[in-house]
Amino acid sequence: MTNLLFVALGGSIGAVLRYLMSIIMIQLFGSSFPFGTLLVNVLGSFFMGIVYALGQVSHVSPELKALVGVGLLGALTTFSTFSNETLLLMQQGYWFKSLINVLLNVSLCIFMVYLGQQLVFSRV
């Protein structure tokens, strides 16, 4: 039951952060490309790499994993929004933007998980 509370707490923080980052990115760059979703997915992937690597090299409590890994990062990142925004770009005829969105999200997110892990592993 305690872990559920940690997931809920982290999730509420992550959801609010995602919302705020999306608003900021729209204000900075407009809404013609889903930069907000890309940003939260890339940042979330980086921190997920850190959380995973910390769990490999030291003891990370189940509560911290629930709070940060499942809750905060789970709510911060969003595959469903990425998928919906990509489909909307396609439906609007922006095939190149949709392809760029897919390539950037997938490649940058995988790279950022790796980078986060390497940051931790290089310090052990």
Curated annotation (Swiss-Prot):
* Protein residues bound to Na(+): 74, 77
Keywords of this entry: Cell inner membrane, Cell membrane, Ion channel, Ion transport, Membrane, Metal-binding, Sodium, Transmembrane, Transmembrane helix, Transport
User: What activity regulation does UniProt give?
Assistant: Na(+) is not transported, but it plays an essential structural role and its presence is essential for fluoride channel function.
Has the keyword Calcium been applied to this entry? Answer: no
Give the location in the cell. Cell inner membrane
Q: Which reaction does it catalyse?
A: fluoride(in) = fluoride(out)
- Its signal peptide is none
Q: Which InterPro entries match?
A: FluC
The UniProt entry lists membrane topology as: Multi-pass membrane protein
Q: What is its main location?
A: membrane
Query: Which cysteines does the record link by disulfide bonds?
Result: none
What one GO molecular function would you report for this record? fluoride channel activity
Cellular-component GO terms for this entry: plasma membrane
| GO terms of biological process kind | cellular detoxification of fluoride
Transmembrane feature ranges: 4-24, 35-55, 62-82, 95-115
Q: Which HAMAP family match?
A: FluC
What protein family is recorded?
Answer: Belongs to the fluoride channel Fluc/FEX (TC 1.A.43) family.
Q: What does this protein do?
A: Fluoride-specific ion channel. Important for reducing fluoride concentration in the cell, thus reducing its toxicity.
Its recorded name reads Fluoride-specific ion channel FluC
Its gene name is fluC
